[in-house]
């Protein structure tokens, strides 16, 4: 007798860990940069360059890209951009890690502070967070039937249907988007870009035949110095569509996507945004090269009939079992919540207008409850304002806006795998009377919840002649009174009788029994 087996291809997170570390650096201004009068804006971004798994540890090498905008009193531009990167190398202890493991590392800046030591020297302090995950592709070979020899003769076996989520496609790729953004005619030509921010909104992925459709929005903000004697400071903000397709061999419309994405940053922590001439040779076009780093997982749900148990009627059939684990999609959920807040500005000068606002959604705490996945965190908000101060008209303020939200996922447990992706879908900051900021935001959260299903898998079976003493010890006829948990299968196994025979003998319509129910068993019936 041989088992018919089916291979099931799946993935799981083997282990994960989070570390924090600090970076501090005193930075001297390059000779070609004018003296600092006051600091205005700063931001930091983690750029991961290399991930090296080892024994019980992972080495991560990367850079902290920074951009600092400051005021100067020297002749020329009123605002100056200073950008660069600080290298780092960190070891993350992860017990059980092997050099052959596949490790994914995400880096975020928890806090980035710039202090002015003097007009030519700055102190940079940053708190960085690294999240490492060992992702494992694994296969389970499970029995789905029996064949050969005396299969089916004197043998009872139980087949149970199970919903399984198989991994169909697993790969990393990059989706690139090039766009030329012309300035409106009312805007002056660009001399140099002082500050920029590129962010993604409403990004979606849809499987198609042999390709993956990408759609969403790209929000672009630039603060620039205009051409001309006055060198005026202007800002421009726009939203452009993100759409296109990515070749994906084996992709089909019915597959379920779980795709993690991030915007590829340059060394200084920003996407590439350049000044380009228009057809008249004037510097009026912003050239954007946007790249999305994609971690692609495409799944397929399938119902598979699995051989769960087997016993012999005329012989001993002994199953050899092992522990196995299957993956099952519990839910693909997207939820949105509105966040509103009022914040008093602490700028020091009367504010004339809010020029630009940007934010990052952080998840500080994630907890599984009866209602679903409870999330707590904040919007790390940066607001650029124009003030009445003619010497330093541009001032920024940073705020943390708290939120709490529960993703409604029925039946989720703490042992289930659920990585939540957060996104700032909408952000609006208005200036109220009394130097107060009115903040309105829409946050979007999405997750794919995978349930782990442990089971005993039959690896093989051993056939032996049945002990004659066992058969002799069975009664010729007996009225069996069902105990809690009994069914026709457990009774048939105990008395070496076919389930169908017991069912027909007792005129039963199902194999389920209620406690105390009487079942007639007659030895020798087949």
Kindly label every feature range from the protein language model.
Residues 1-474:
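Membrane-lipid interaction segments
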Residues 491:
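Short alpha-helical "recognition helix" segments of helix-turn-helix
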Residues 497-526:
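Extracellular LysM carbohydrate-binding repeats and other cell-envelope/extracellular binding modules
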């Amino acid at each position: 007798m041989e088992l018919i087996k089916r291979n099931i291809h799946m993935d799981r997170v083997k282990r994960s860990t989070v570390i924090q570390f600090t970076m501090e650096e005193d930075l001297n201004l390059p000779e070609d940069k004018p003296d600092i009068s006051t600091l205005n804006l700063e931001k930091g971004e983690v750029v991961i360059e290399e991930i090296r798994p080892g024994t019980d540890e992972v080495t991560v090498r990367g850079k902290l890209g920074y951009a600092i905008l400051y005021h100067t009193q020297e002749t020329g531009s009123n605002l100056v951009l200073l950008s660069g990167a600080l290298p780092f190398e960190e070891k993350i202890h992860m017990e059980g890690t092997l050099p052959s493991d596949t490790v994914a590392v995400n880096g975020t800046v928890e806090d980035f502070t710039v202090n002015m030591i003097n007009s030519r020297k700055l102190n940079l302090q940053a708190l960085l967070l690294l999240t490492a995950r060992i992702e494992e592709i694994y296969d389970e070979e499970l029995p789905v039937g029996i064949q050969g020899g005396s299969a089916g003769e004197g043998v009872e076996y139980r087949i149970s249907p199970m919903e399984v989520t198989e991994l169909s496609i697993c790969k990393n790729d990059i989706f690139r988007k090039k766009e030329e953004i012309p300035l409106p005619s009312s805007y002056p030509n660009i001399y140099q870009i002082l500050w920029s921010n590129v962010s993604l909104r409403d990004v979606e992925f849809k499987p198609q035949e042999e390709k993956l459709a990408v759609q969403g929005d790209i929000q672009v903000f630039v603060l620039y110095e205009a051409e001309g004697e006055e060198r005026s400071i202007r800002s421009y903000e726009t939203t452009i569509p993100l759409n296109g397709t990515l070749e994906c061999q084996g992709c089909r419309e019915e597959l379920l996507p779980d795709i993690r994405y991030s915007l590829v940053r340059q060394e200084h922590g920003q996407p590439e945004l350049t000044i380009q001439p228009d057809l008249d040779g004037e510097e009026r076009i912003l050239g954007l090269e946007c790249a999305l780093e994609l971690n692609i997982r495409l799944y397929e749900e399938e119902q598979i009939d699995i051989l769960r148990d087997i016993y012999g009627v005329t012989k001993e059939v002994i199953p050899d079992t092992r522990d196995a684990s299957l993956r099952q999609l519990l839910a693909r959920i997207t939820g949105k919540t509105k966040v509103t807040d009022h914040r008093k500005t602490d700028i020091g000068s009367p504010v004339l207008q809010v020029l630009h606002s940007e934010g990052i959604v952080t998840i500080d705490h994630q907890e599984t409850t009866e209602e679903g996945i409870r999330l707590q965190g904040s919007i790390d908000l940066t607001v650029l304002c124009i003030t009445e101060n003619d010497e330093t008209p541009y001032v920024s303020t940073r705020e943390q806006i708290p939120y709490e939200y529960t993703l409604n996922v029925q039946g989720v447990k703490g042992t289930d795998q659920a990585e939540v992706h957060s996104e700032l879908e909408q952000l609006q900051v208005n200036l109220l009377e009394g130097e107060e900021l009115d903040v309105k935001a829409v946050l979007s959260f999405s997750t794919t919840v995978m349930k782990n299903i442990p089971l005993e898998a039959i690896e093989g079976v051993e056939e032996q002649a049945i002990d004659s003493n066992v058969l002799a010890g069975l009664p010729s006829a007996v009225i069996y009174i069902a105990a809690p948990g009994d069914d026709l299968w457990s009774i048939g196994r105990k008395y070496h009788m076919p389930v169908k025979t017991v069912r027909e003998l007792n005129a039963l319509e199902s194999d389920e029994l209620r406690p105390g129910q009487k079942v007639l068993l007659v030895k020798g019936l087949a």
